[in-house]
């Protein structure tokens, strides 16, 4: 199996390096990842400056671009040979609920899906037990790849930040929902000019049983199939009726 591995935390991040090490025990893995942290880059592509992939001593690549850039570049002729699967992660921090809209980790997997490959995104609820998340992914890939992976959607995996033997199981979940984000943080730079920081993610608003939030918070691995079609089909008839009534 040939796996393209990317992320949004950057090539040197601990999560991607641990995952690469474990995946290479049963697959041929090529890393094409950003040269620095590009968290929350979503699916943005770099269109106004050239991409400069750098071939590293270990045979992998880092790119001066976004996670989606990396996957787009890798699968559109930059790499020789056919890839069978795109894996993105391990992200330092969960991508639950509304997080998937902003996540570069999820976006890298979505770009793989867009280019016709089955794709997986994996995130850890912390920064400690990357080995747990890596083991979960390595356990799941043979099962998902042979039977369930659909190139029209991705599998979003979130793993509790606990030892592997404390994982209670795996749950297939829907996305939950976060409350509106908190206000930005205002500070002053040394010159007295105002600067702003986007603060941490808001607390969950919908974390009831059956959501990805609930699963991870209760010690389960959360798996959510995600598709690109964001159409609100339930609203289409009502909207059409409203337009025709005017």
UniProtKB/Swiss-Prot annotation:
InterPro entries: SurE, SurE-like_Pase/nucleotidase, SurE-like_sf. Keywords: Cytoplasm, Hydrolase, Metal-binding, Nucleotide-binding. It is an enzyme of class 3 (hydrolase). Its EC number is 3.1.3.5. GO terms for cellular component: cytoplasm. It is found in: Cytoplasm. Its main location: cytoplasm. Binds 1 divalent metal cation per subunit. It catalyses: a ribonucleoside 5'-phosphate + H2O = a ribonucleoside + phosphate. Belongs to the SurE nucleotidase family. PANTHER family: 5'-NUCLEOTIDASE SURE, 5'_3'-NUCLEOTIDASE SURE. Nucleotidase that shows phosphatase activity on nucleoside 5'-monophosphates. This is 5'-nucleotidase SurE. It comes from Mannheimia succiniciproducens (strain KCTC 0769BP / MBEL55E).
């Amino acid at each position: 199996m040939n796996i393209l591995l990317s992320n949004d935390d950057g090539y040197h991040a601990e999560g991607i390096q641990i995952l690469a090490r474990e995946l290479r025990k049963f697959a041929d893995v090529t890393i094409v990842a950003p040269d620095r942290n590009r968290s929350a880059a979503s699916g943005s592509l770099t269109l106004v400056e050239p991409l400069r992939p750098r071939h590293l001593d270990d045979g992998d690549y880092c790119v001066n671009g976004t996670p989606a850039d990396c996957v787009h570049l890798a699968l559109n002729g930059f790499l020789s040979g056919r890839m069978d699967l795109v894996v993105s992660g391990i992200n330092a921090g969960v991508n639950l609920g509304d997080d998937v809209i902003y996540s570069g980790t999820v976006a890298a997997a979505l770009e793989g899906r867009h280019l016709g490959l089955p794709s997986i995104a994996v995130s850890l609820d912390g920064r400690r037990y990357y080995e747990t998340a890596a083991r979960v992914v390595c356990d799941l890939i043979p099962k998902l790849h042979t039977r369930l992976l659909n190139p029209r959607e991705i599998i979003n995996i979130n793993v509790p930040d606990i030892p592997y033997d404390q994982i209670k199981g795996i749950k297939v979940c829907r996305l939950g929902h976060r409350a509106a984000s908190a206000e930005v943080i205002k500070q002053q730079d040394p010159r007295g000019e105002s600067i702003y920081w986007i603060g941490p993610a808001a607390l969950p608003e919908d974390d009831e049983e059956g959501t990805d939030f609930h699963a991870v918070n209760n010690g389960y691995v959360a798996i959510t199939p995600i598709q690109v079609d964001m159409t609100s089909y339930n609203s289409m008839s009502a909207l059409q009726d409203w337009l025709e009534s005017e």
